[in-house]
Amino acid sequence: MFTINAEVRKEQGKGASRRLRRANKFPAIVYGGNQELVSIELDHDQVINMEQKAEFYSDVLTLVIDGKETKVKVQAVQRHPFKPKLAHIDFLRA
């Protein structure tokens, strides 16, 4: 089982996302389960190591968002066109 630490995003938009990526983080979103969607930021180095395993895409993951655990599954992953970097992940509440 994978556990990922996340923080709620304070800023939205293209400029804020670019600043996150320069700080070795990237944006993500959590939705589903009759709850509000939550925009989060993830540490790239932590997630890229997990993402290389097949179980990352099929298992239920635990997101720790500001100290609160949420069970999620990966819905979609966006990657940089030519760099080995993640650009964005969509998580669906399990």
Curated annotation (Swiss-Prot):
The keyword Coiled coil does not apply. One of its GO terms (biological process) is translation. It comes from Photorhabdus laumondii subsp. laumondii (strain DSM 15139 / CIP 105565 / TT01) (Photorhabdus luminescens subsp. laumondii). One of its GO terms (cellular component) is cytosolic large ribosomal subunit. Keywords: Ribonucleoprotein, Ribosomal protein, RNA-binding, rRNA-binding. It comes from the Bacteria. Belongs to the bacterial ribosomal protein bL25 family. The keyword RNA-binding applies. Part of the 50S ribosomal subunit; part of the 5S rRNA/L5/L18/L25 subcomplex. Contacts the 5S rRNA. Binds to the 5S rRNA independently of L5 and L18. This is Large ribosomal subunit protein bL25. This is one of the proteins that binds to the 5S RNA in the ribosome where it forms part of the central protuberance. HAMAP family: Ribosomal_bL25. Coiled coil: none annotated. One of its GO terms (molecular function) is 5S rRNA binding.
